[in-house]
């Protein structure tokens, strides 16, 4: 174009779904290899940076997979960051520490208390673009603040559960819709209000 910009579609969900339906993978081994290849390619593309790069590590499957592939393709230890909680029932830092040790990353932990979490709640509307019902936004913000002093780019496993259906709500949503989708909207609204009042 005359100003040096070209407008082009980078990615299309509709095209991806259409292509996937036409070229279904029926072999588990092929699916695993394609997934690994796609993840490695994505990580390599995201790792092209002229600034220090690291990752957020929770010890869960998603972030552990990302960090594992990063470390596998890195010539030096990847810097990993995790948030730990003083309350044992919320603390997953021990899992992250074990994964970091196994992978040989340069691991940094920050522990937070309930008061640390409460202190940033008032700032959340300014930090995030839109409201969302995920309490992980608090530790995510804190780990970002922690990592900022060490690096400018960090990869994470965020979105893995949504992408791979890791939450039961995604499994049940379609089943529930198949049962009640035919009902008129006013009746669905009444049912929704009743369901949300159940403790």
Please place each PLM-identified region on the residue numbering:
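Short acidic-glycine loop/turn motifs at beta-strand connectors
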Residues: 1-4, 159
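Predominantly a core beta-strand signature of beta-propeller blades
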Residues: 4-8, 106-107
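Short beta->alpha transition motifs characteristic of CBS
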Residues: 9-14
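ATP-dependent adenylate-handling active sites, centered on carboxylate activation for C-N bond formation
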Residues: 15-199
């Amino acid at each position: 174009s005359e100003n040096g910009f070209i407008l082009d579609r980078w990615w299309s969900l509709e095209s991806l779904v259409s292509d996937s339906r036409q070229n279904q993978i029926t072999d588990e081994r092929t699916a695993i290899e394609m997934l690994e290849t796609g993840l490695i390619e994505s990580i390599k593309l995201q790792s092209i940076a002229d600034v220090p790069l690291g990752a957020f590590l929770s010890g869960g499957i998603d972030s552990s997979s990302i960090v594992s592939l990063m470390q596998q393709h890195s010539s030096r230890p990847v810097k990993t960051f995790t948030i730990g909680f003083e309350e044992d029932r919320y603390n997953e830092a021990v899992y992250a520490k074990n994964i970091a040790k196994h992978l040989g990353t340069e691991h940094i932990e920050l522990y937070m208390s309930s008061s640390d979490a409460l202190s940033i709640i008032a700032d959340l509307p300014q930090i995030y673009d839109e409201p969302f019902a995920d309490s992980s936004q608090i530790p995510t913000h804190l780990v970002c603040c922690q990592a900022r002093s060490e690096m400018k780019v960090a990869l994470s496993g965020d979105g893995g559960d949504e992408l791979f259906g890791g939450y039961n709500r995604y499994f049940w949503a379609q089943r529930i819709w198949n049962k009640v989708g035919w009902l008129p909207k006013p009746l669905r609204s009444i049912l929704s209000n009743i369901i949300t009042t159940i403790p």
